[in-house]
Amino acid sequence: MTDSHVPHPESPAVEEGEERPHRRIKSFVMRAGRMTEGQQRGLDQGLPLYGLSLTDAPVDFDQVFGRAAPRTLEIGFGMGHSLLEMAAAAPEHDFIGVEVHSPGVGALLNGVLTQGLTNVRVYDCDAIEVLNRCVADNSLDRLMLFFPDPWHKSRHHKRRIVQPEFAALVRSKLKVGGVFHMATDWGPYAEYMLEVMSVASGYRNQAEDNQYVPRPAERPITKFERRGEKLGHGVWDLKFEKVD
């Protein structure tokens, strides 16, 4: 255990009276995981072809994909099953996936290579950094956030990715008419997201009753979701459209 009073040798010392630099609270925790042969193949062969790096200026995705097409960005695609299925089903659309966990990145890219898809690109870094630095304003047709970590404990709610500031950031990146699509299997988090998004300016809830939309056909059902349904667990989808 490291003595918390001893500064890290690579960290600059903070003089008395000097404010420490603000550190943004992240919504994810890095986890180590074993890599399968297929996942390693995805990283080794797929990342050089389809991986993107953080830039200091918005990326020209028309140039990246070699065309102008409807564009979707998914944050936290996990093992990539849904994103892969959606990309294969809609070759006329472009998909940008963001995921920090290497096994998931490798799994998605292995699928991209196996299926010969050309409409997928991947960032393996913090989604907030990607949105702030790489995505131009008013450029996305859809942003998807499926089953984010709900951070159940009250003291951890500040780690939830859906916050008023995040809603505003997403809105700035969507085109007018673009949709922020969220899904969760945790009822209290669904209520929380609905509360945040209902007061976020510039959005319209696409649900007729201003609550939750029926499960959209375009969102694939995962094995985890099927297992939950058998156990009686609910899933809530929210769709908010940018109106101005």
Curated annotation (Swiss-Prot):
Stated name of the protein: tRNA (guanine-N(7)-)-methyltransferase
Keyword Methyltransferase applies: yes
Domain of life: Bacteria
Keyword terms of this UniProt record: Methyltransferase, S-adenosyl-L-methionine, Transferase, tRNA processing
An example molecular function term from Gene Ontology annotations: tRNA (guanine(46)-N7)-methyltransferase activity
Gene encoding the protein: trmB
Pfam families membership: Methyltransf_4
Family membership noted in the UniProt record: Belongs to the class I-like SAM-binding methyltransferase superfamily. TrmB family.
Keyword Signal set for record: no
EC number from the UniProt entry: 2.1.1.33
UniProt pathway: tRNA modification; N(7)-methylguanine-tRNA biosynthesis
